């Protein structure tokens, strides 16, 4: 019964990671953030693989999940550095959209308490079809919301890493005892 608690905890944690990743995926789609969309998609696939491995007693699948959590933590640390503009990174670049559009984080204009005001294009027509959007009154700036999302992902991944290592070690011990009999 003691072995089940680690597995059950990992299943619950994977479910939380799926919910968190799906929520993040939705808002990244709304903001046309293509790099995070791709990362979230891969994350969802690997978490499902880890969930399957945990339920079906497949330690190799859990190992893939464990390696992915390390990569996922690295990606989320990069996102935190990007939005906090650490090390020469700038949140105003088109890096998250692969330089194919001028879209930014959905939270930039739709954060909690934000009042969005669309201004008409300039008289010179320099802005073509783009209109300037003025955003005021945000309770929390968008970059901090993105940092919070990444911090939650890091926390869930680190706890998932620990539980995955525990479940793998329990699975390996069970295999060793079965081989010795």
UniProtKB/Swiss-Prot annotation:
The chain crosses the membrane at residues 2-22, 35-55, 62-82, 152-172. It is a multi-pass membrane protein. GO terms for cellular component: membrane; plasma membrane. Pfam families: NKAIN. It is found in: Cell membrane. Keywords: Cell membrane, Membrane, Transmembrane, Transmembrane helix. Detected in the brain only and specifically in neurons. Expressed in multiple regions such as cerebral cortex, thalamus, hippocampus, olfactory bulb and brainstem as well as in cerebellum with low expression in granular cell layer. The keyword Signal does not apply. It comes from the Eukaryota. InterPro entries: Na/K-Atpase_Interacting. Interacts with ATP1B1. Belongs to the NKAIN family. This is Sodium/potassium-transporting ATPase subunit beta-1-interacting protein 3. It comes from Mus musculus.
